[in-house]
Structure formats: C-alpha cells, structure tokens
Amino acid sequence: MKIYKLKDISEFIRNGVTIKQDISSKEGIPITRIETISKGTIDFNKLGYANISKIEKYKEWLLKKGDILISHINSEKHLGKSAIYLDNNYDIIHGMNLLCIRVIDKKVFPEYLQLFFKTNQYKKQIKKITKKSVNQASFSVNDFKEILITVPDLNIQEKIIKKIKVLEKILENNKLKLAYLSELTKSLFTRMFGDIKSNDKNWKIYKFSEKLKISSGGTPSKANKIYWENGTISWIGSNMCNDEIITKNDGKFITEEGLKNSSAKIYKMNTVIVALVGATIGKTGLLKFETSTNQNIAALEIKNMDYSPEFLFFLLQNLYYKFTELGGDTFKMANLNFIKNLPLISPPIELQNKFTERVEKIEKLKFIFDKALISNIFGKLYKKVSA
C-alpha cells in the first residue's frame, strides 16, 4: 500500500484542445464538452461537433480506453466530477474545459482511480483547491496533480474492480427502477385527473393568474463583489429546473445587500418554479428549501388552500406542450404573461391531497433506489482498502 500524488501515477493530466464548436452541426468527429460528463458517465448525446472529418491534426487528442475526464471549471456542485472512457471503437476528441488523466498501467488501473474519484477523501481535497468566482468555481491543473491517493497492489485493485462491477449492475438496475417510478407518478396523475390537453374529466378551468401569485426573481450585479462574496442566501438559476423535487442549491449564494439591490426575492418551501428560457424552458421544480432565484425562473405561489404544491408541480409538467408551441426555432422564450394565461384545472383539494400522499410514497421508494446509496458503498469500499 502506497500513497501517491496523482501526477506520480499518470502519463499526463492535461486540459483539452481548443476547437470552436458549431452548435448547429452534428457532423464530423465528436468533441467532448463540459456537459459530456454531467451525469458521471460519457454521454454520447452531449458531444460537440466542428465538422472535423480528418483526424491527423487531432490524433494526439483522441481519447483512449481508460482515460478519465474531470470537470475542473463548473458550478461548485459539479466540480471534480469524473467519467471514464471505455469504448476504443468510438473516436472522440478531448476538447477544452475538461481535464483528462491517463494512468501509468504498472501503478494503477483506471477503474480503481475512477473509484477514488467517487470518494469523500477525493471530494475533501477538491474542496481545498477550489477557487470560487461569481459565476463558477475552478481548480488549477497543477493543484489537481498534487492530490493524494492511496494505492494498493495491482492484484488487490483487480479484486476491488470486480466488486465495483457487481455494484454497477445494482446501480443500473436501480436506475431502471427509478425510471419506472417516475413514469408511475406521471401515469397516476393522468388516471386521477385525466388528459390535460382535452380536459376529458371536465374540470372547471381557471387561468393561473386567477388562483396563483406569479413572479420572477433577479440577478444582483456581478460587478459588485459585496452582493456575492460570503453570501448566505441561496440563489438558483433555471438550470435547476429539471422536473425534479429540489432539495438544495448548486452552490450559489448572494448577500443581504445583493438581495436588497436587485429584483431577487426569497421563495418559501413548496413553491413551484418553471424555467422561462434556455435549454430547460418549460421544465419545472418543487422547492423543498427557501431560496432566491434569477429572472429566468417564474415562481408560482398558491394563494389559498385550493391547490396542493405537488398537484401544481405535476400539472405544469403536463403543460410542457404549451412551451413547445412558442415561436422561435433556435431560442424560445416564455414570459410571466404566458405563465399567467396557462389553463389551471380545479379538481377537489381532497383528490389532490390523495395524489400527494401517493406521490410521497413513490418518492420514498425513489430515495431507496437513489444512486447516492451506491456511491456511499464505493466510498466505504475505498476507505476499507486505504485504512
């Protein structure tokens, strides 16, 4: 058992090649982007393109089996996230804004290193080298090279990797269960409240503005440090709207001064939010903590006891088709008037509460199958080895 710095077990640790990517293109050899590893795996649907057909110029930047990509410029929540490349039959160019680490075979297996990148020991070291700015966080390549890792003999690493593969099968099975439970909630909503488009249960319809308080937030000036530095007030953007219950923010906070000197406002727990612009337009969130938001989010607060937050949250997801009908091929945008005029069906609150009870049961099951449970097992396995 030895302790190494990452630089001592690597052929290289480097940033990618600078290539101007064409967002409208899907032609040529794909290039990695920050989003490529956003889910902790190589997502082949989130690669960039620049119409590159000849590989000669970029041959040295092609990923090889066992290469690990690391996010070193991102929101604090995603900083240090990694993904391992295991497909030698698919050419991908390593683009900038992700680090790539290629290990020395005789010292460590890539799969063992990827296990380390899931542990609290690694995350604590990342936290120490993180430099925060207003928009994002980052760490330098040189600081990353100094991170310490406990490395057992190769035969022990091999045994650990076999255990990991068993755990990953469990994880994959859990993902399928999570997907099933998400679909179960959607079908439950339709069974209880009918098809929203046709209103086949003939519920009375109001406009959102008649029953809900609708507003948006704001962004304190990023040129003024006192609005951001050492902030304690949670502040989120539309990237957090992913049709999910939101239990914490992604690392951005503003100060009291920032709140006072901007349109930002604090929304209470159980406020339903929806993205007005960007890649997540029409996607929703149900807040489970107090937070302020930026101007790209509409917040829906219930005026009285006629509606449950959970019902409203899933109703909005069923109204996503309205957002797809907005004009603009490349950049769609909704505004508060659009939200205010959305149709709001009015089933009895007793039925809504029954739906909420069932949703809570499903959410508990989803928690049981959450991949974080497996990540904890990874961490315990590494801790046992490195003790």
What are the residue ranges of the model-derived segments?
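Non-catalytic DNA-recognition/assembly elements of restriction-modification systems
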Residues: 1-16, 146-161, 177-187, 191-219, ...
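Sequence-specific dsDNA recognition surfaces
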Residues: 7-22, 35-68, 209-225, 239-269
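A short beta-sheet element
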Residues: 33-34, 55-118, 237-238, 251-317, ...
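Active-site region of PLP-dependent enzymes
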Residues: 131, 172, 326
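Hydrophobic alpha-helical bundles that form the membrane domains of multi-pass transporters
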Residues: 167-170
